[in-house]
Amino acid sequence: MIEWKTFCTIFWQRFNQNKLTQAAGYLTYSTMLAIVPLIMVVFSIFSAFPVFNEVTGALKEFIFTNFAPSASDVVGQYIDEFVNNSKQMSAVGIISLIVVALMLINSIDRTLNSIWHDTSTRPIFTSFAIYWLILTLGPLLVGTSIAASAYVKTMFENASGFSFGLKLLSFVPFLSTWFIFTVIYMVVPNKKVSIKHSAAGALIAAVFFTLGKQAFAWYIVTFPSYQLIYGAMATLPIMLLWIQLSWTFVLLGAQLAAVLAEVRSEKMINLEQIEETK
């Protein structure tokens, strides 16, 4: 019990020291600036692979449902319009959009490394290569996951006696979120992060993210004060609030993984000191 209280105390101290609520606000601002360029790049990548044409709609639904609960239809229409407008841009404009998308990834990189108190920097070409891989391979991995889930779901629906399998598939969004957070916590920090600590932090973040999404959607539908106050503009503050909460959950999971590593490191040091005194 004492160790658990100590762990919670350390976690809360680190959460406040790193000013993660302010960091979530900064990432929210960066996300709002980069969301259209990022989505444009993602769907441009998908258009280059005809095999993903059938799952593009499913991917849109996945993105909008997770990042704009209760307003996904409206946000989807706006994003589609913005992306269509971006297709008329010149090469210089497209490059600038890609740069903005990469800047968001850079912001995430610096924020997560500050949680692990890592001040080292990667060479600029290495950083660019990593960011570009995240920007290109990330959507492809998500698309592959959605395509595989859709294929398996079709198999279960066409076969009798597989209702249990369909119920299991309902956990795919949660498991996908857990997997994505785990990979982020392992790959982005410059320090080596164990898969055990990454998975533990990612699990908590995924639980908060999933429950928070449902609670947020319920609140917006049950207490439609934003719609009454802002009218047609209600989508913007709703989306801002949810992105802020989402980043708070992500950073909370990252801080948990970092504290787990910190506590383990301190235990190892204490054990070594005990061994030396024997």
Curated annotation (Swiss-Prot):
The UniProt record lists the keyword Transmembrane helix: yes
Compartments in which it is found: Cell inner membrane
Membrane topology: Multi-pass membrane protein
The UniProt record lists the keyword Membrane: yes
Positions of transmembrane segments: 32-52, 88-108, 123-143, 168-188, 203-223, 232-252
Recorded superkingdom: Bacteria
GO CC list: plasma membrane
Primary site of residence: membrane
Keywords, in A-Z order: Cell inner membrane, Cell membrane, Membrane, Transmembrane, Transmembrane helix
Pfam families: Virul_fac_BrkB
Entry similarity comment: Belongs to the UPF0761 family.
HAMAP family per record: UPF0761 (MF_00672)
Protein name: UPF0761 membrane protein NT05HA_1801
